[in-house]
Amino acid sequence: MPTPPPQPRPLLLASGSSYRRELLRKLGLHFTAVAPDIDEAARPGEAADDLALRLACEKALALAPAYPDHLIIGSDQVAVLGDSRLGKPGTHEKAVAQLLRASGNTVTFLTGLCVHDAVSGVSHTGLDRCHVHFRRLDRDQIERYVTADEPYDCAGAFKSEGLGIALIERFEGEDPNALVGLPLIQLTEILKRFGIAVF
């Protein structure tokens, strides 16, 4: 495997998510991952895309004082069905309920991205929008899926990188990685602005 170009700056992934760590490893870059401690509650009247972007930036900015030499990557995902947000279900019962609502419908996954330069204070952001069209699913199918994949920590109770891919008819979006939680296409473009190239 070719050696990647030297990294001029240390990278920090502001996330405790194993899914995001696996995605970032795809780029072959050296990085550290630390989970930030922020309040992820939505503000009154806050739009879903604004929430995803704000939380991505807050995650990155929260770690800047402790990592003053780093480029810090923050990302957050919000799932929307109609006018309702689908959060991380947390329990089996809530996961089943979310997927019963998603059955036969389209869920939009909004993934916010922020890369913050702790040295200069400059941030670049992006937002990926992916529409996922779910198959018509009965309760037994959903129960079996939730038991097998345990998507309790995933927005919309859905793991596209796991068995969840069998729940959908199709998806419309620019970057399938964003569905997992980190839009790599936008990330590589933003990193180039900071002088970090994958190739």
Curated annotation (Swiss-Prot):
EC nos? 3.6.1.-
**Active site per UniProt:** 76 (proton acceptor)
Q: Which Pfam families match?
A: Maf
Q: Which InterPro entries match?
A: ITPase-like_fam, Maf-like
The free-text function statement in the UniProt record for this protein reads: Nucleoside triphosphate pyrophosphatase that hydrolyzes 7-methyl-GTP (m(7)GTP). May have a dual role in cell division arrest and in preventing the incorporation of modified nucleotides into cellular nucleic acids.
What name does the UniProt record give this protein? 7-methyl-GTP pyrophosphatase
Report the catalytic activity: N(7)-methyl-GTP + H2O = N(7)-methyl-GMP + diphosphate + H(+)
* Cofactor or coenzyme needed: a divalent metal cation
UniProt keyword Aminoacyl-tRNA synthetase present: no
**Site entry: Important for substrate specificity:** 19, 77, 161
Tell me the GO BP annotations in alphabetical order: nucleotide metabolic process
Q: Where in the cell is it found?
A: Cytoplasm
Q: Which family does it belong to?
A: Belongs to the Maf family. YceF subfamily.
Q: What is its main location?
A: cytoplasm
If you read the UniProt record, what top EC class would you report for this enzyme, in one word?
Answer: hydrolase
A single GO molecular-function term is: nucleoside triphosphate diphosphatase activity
- Give the keywords, sorted: Cytoplasm, Hydrolase, Nucleotide metabolism
Gene Ontology annotations for the cellular component aspect, listed alphabetically: cytoplasm
Q: Where are the transmembrane segments?
A: none
